[in-house]
Amino acid sequence: MLGPAVLGLSLWALLHPGTGAPLCLSQQLRMKGDYVLGGLFPLGEAEEAGLRSRTRPSSPVCTRFSSNGLLWALAMKMAVEEINNKSDLLPGLRLGYDLFDTCSEPVVAMKPSLMFLAKAGSRDIAAYCNYTQYQPRVLAVIGPHSSELAMVTGKFFSFFLMPQVSYGASMELLSARETFPSFFRTVPSDRVQLTAAAELLQEFGWNWVAALGSDDEYGRQGLSIFSALAAARGICIAHEGLVPLPRADDSRLGKVQDVLHQVNQSSVQVVLLFASVHAAHALFNYSISSRLSPKVWVASEAWLTSDLVMGLPGMAQMGTVLGFLQRGAQLHEFPQYVKTHLALATDPAFCSALGEREQGLEEDVVGQRCPQCDCITLQNVSAGLNHHQTFSVYAAVYSVAQALHNTLQCNASGCPAQDPVKPWQLLENMYNLTFHVGGLPLRFDSSGNVDMEYDLKLWVWQGSVPRLHDVGRFNGSLRTERLKIRWHTSDNQKPVSRCSRQCQEGQVRRVKGFHSCCYDCVDCEAGSYRQNPDDIACTFCGQDEWSPERSTRCFRRRSRFLAWGEPAVLLLLLLLSLALGLVLAALGLFVHHRDSPLVQASGGPLACFGLVCLGLVCLSVLLFPGQPSPARCLAQQPLSHLPLTGCLSTLFLQAAEIFVESELPLSWADRLSGCLRGPWAWLVVLLAMLVEVALCTWYLVAFPPEVVTDWHMLPTEALVHCRTRSWVSFGLAHATNATLAFLCFLGTFLVRSQPGCYNRARGLTFAMLAYFITWVSFVPLLANVQVVLRPAVQMGALLLCVLGILAAFHLPRCYLLMRQPGLNTPEFFLGGGPGDAQGQNDGNTGNQGKHE
């Protein structure tokens, strides 16, 4: 604890700053303790010329000052002092620290690393077969900041299994436990940061980007990881290049020019720059001078907060800068801590007392730690007081303290006395360590990484230096606040960076060239659809589905058949009503006048049977509309053909009788006429119907019609219909009827009618003509009409056939019965003279009269 006098001096120094006297900050970078922690911080930067001209293994001179490095060192100092003042973490023990400057150069970081590994109380690193009992000067190391340095120092510390906790090295390679078994860090690895960057590109629809990295291990590995992440998300890298690290001469300027030329050639509007600070500075320095068009820059954490890059003149013209910074707990007391220690560093009495207390730390070996730190003021470091990585340093110290607490098995009363803890013993308790810092729970995973959230930062220019504004967050998934983002475009519209335009709904990509992001948009045809926006081929609908052109989904097909409510069916039902009404009317008249010469000349009971059959033909039409079923399909043809056969067989008997009476000799006519009337006539009808039954049975057994669903006939519907399996068998089912009609026509076409008598042959001739015209027209019409309308065609053919027979044969007789009853005489219909009334019952007399 600081004494009252010191506190008073510090208060006086804060009230009277800027005396111009040198500070003693460099003497505050070391403190003794029971266990000492080493620290590697970029307190300064070495001159490039000095590094290139180095010919002897001497230490380079670090002349330039790094304010962030000093603040991070003070954060470690504050954390150690807090732990020493607490009674719950390491009671009774005191931590010390030994902080060194790395100059951000591996060659400079080597010397303090060797010093840390020297045996406690000496300057030497002795060679042993077994280092299990080896006690180095420090128990663990905090740092370094950069991955480049951690790659070098990590090999040293890993050999001795000395825990090393970096507060800024984020390279994924450092997670390899085989190579770096003692490496830990309080920042997420680059993979997490690059995953967030890839999610950002995907969020804004940027799939045509350039990816640049610094020409070092950090940049090369970052580009390798990003390439894999981008490919998995459908992001195309138009150009991938390395930015050379700057040197004192201009030998690498041409390479920077080539990189920028390639970026311009690729016409990208978004560039991922995963580079170190110096590489980013060199790239932007040349970009500004060459007037590179503004772009969206996705920054790596390494240069996003760099004053060196932010302060470049003209940097505001480079476009929009977005990047991710890790989120940690706020260290509210840290700014006051820095102010207090800067004030103490101006007090000669405090500095003198500090020098006496810290003697014996071998200054002659390490030299003055940070001479440039003794010439600063609060204004030099005020900009970085709230730097995001300050918390990482603070957390790194607490992680080591918690591991030491676990190793020593400390409790509220103290830590049990035991031999000094070796680094490898501490390391065993570092794995999967859980600790709390500032109320935030942290845990090292098996690779030594911590899981921390990222804030999405945007550069917002206020004057000559930008400020970082939060515009989103990443904790495994990205959330952005788009309304807060100010784009560099004139209308503040989000820039577009795509090789090809976004395909419209129902279009898929046809890739051209080598990049999957460069493509033509092709419409999906009917019957296919685009399932996902990134599809390169249309997905076909299932057979029970359909889709229009340029569709994004399929629709269920509805069943299509000849429904009852369709206009064609309604029209046919009207025709059915007409035909059935005429049949019933004719049947009623014939039954009522069944004993009249007209009805007897028309066949008597056979004529009534024929009309009943015509009525059944009309009713069979009702089997065709409606949803098809197996029973309907099987019944349609037999139930329409058999009644028609019965009707045609009665007409055939009429035609045969007329032919016999008119064309054959009288002796033959007398014998045959008896066979064409009475029981023998019914036998002919039965025989004809049995033949039709046989044909229909063969048709149903050999080639039964079946209900089928055709998914391809109609574009949007599933056609359900009765499929005829054999058109030959279908035609043979009509053979009996066609034969009867043909014989009727032949028997009546050339018959001479008797003058003064009713011409019975003419009605039969025209009835058969109507039959043939109907069914001959039916064949080509059925072959060319849509399948769904085929039942309607057959319905129409049946009804027209019935109407034709009625109109030609039955209706004229009905007219005579109703309008000219005086002609309903035996003489007019049977051919006898006016006084020969008995001739109607005498077959021979009747036949003689006809021939006369």
Curated annotation (Swiss-Prot):
PROSITE patterns: G_PROTEIN_RECEP_F3_2, G_PROTEIN_RECEP_F3_4. Residues 536-545 are annotated as: Required for brazzein responsiveness. SUPFAM superfamilies: Periplasmic binding protein-like I. One of its GO terms (molecular function) is taste receptor activity. Gene3D superfamilies: 3.40.50.2300, GPCR, family 3, nine cysteines domain (2.10.50.30). Residues 21-570, 625-639, 704-729, 784-789 are extracellular. Changing residue 537 to T/S/E/V: Abolished the response to brazzein. Keywords: Cell membrane, G-protein coupled receptor, Glycoprotein, Membrane, Receptor, Sensory transduction, Signal, Taste, Transducer, Transmembrane, Transmembrane helix. CDD domains: 7tmC_TAS1R3 (cd15290), PBP1_taste_receptor (cd06363). Glycans are attached at residues 85, 130, 264, 285, 380, 411, 432, 475. Residues 592-603, 661-682, 751-762, 811-852 are cytoplasmic. GO terms for biological process: detection of chemical stimulus involved in sensory perception of sweet taste; G protein-coupled receptor signaling pathway; sensory perception of sweet taste; sensory perception of umami taste. Its main location: membrane. InterPro entries: ANF_lig-bd_rcpt (IPR001828), GPCR_3 (IPR000337), GPCR_3_9-Cys_dom (IPR011500), GPCR_3_9-Cys_sf (IPR038550), GPCR_3_C (IPR017978), GPCR_3_Ca_sens_rcpt-rel (IPR000068), GPCR_3_CS (IPR017979), Peripla_BP_I (IPR028082). It is found in: Cell membrane. It is a multi-pass membrane protein. The chain crosses the membrane at residues 571-591, 604-624, 640-660, 683-703, 730-750, 763-783, 790-810. Residues 1-20 form the signal peptide. Forms homodimers or heterodimers with TAS1R1 and TAS1R2. Putative taste receptor. TAS1R1/TAS1R3 responds to the umami taste stimulus (the taste of monosodium glutamate). TAS1R2/TAS1R3 recognizes diverse natural and synthetic sweeteners. TAS1R3 is essential for the recognition and response to the disaccharide trehalose. Sequence differences within and between species can significantly influence the selectivity and specificity of taste responses. Belongs to the G-protein coupled receptor 3 family. TAS1R subfamily. This is Taste receptor type 1 member 3.
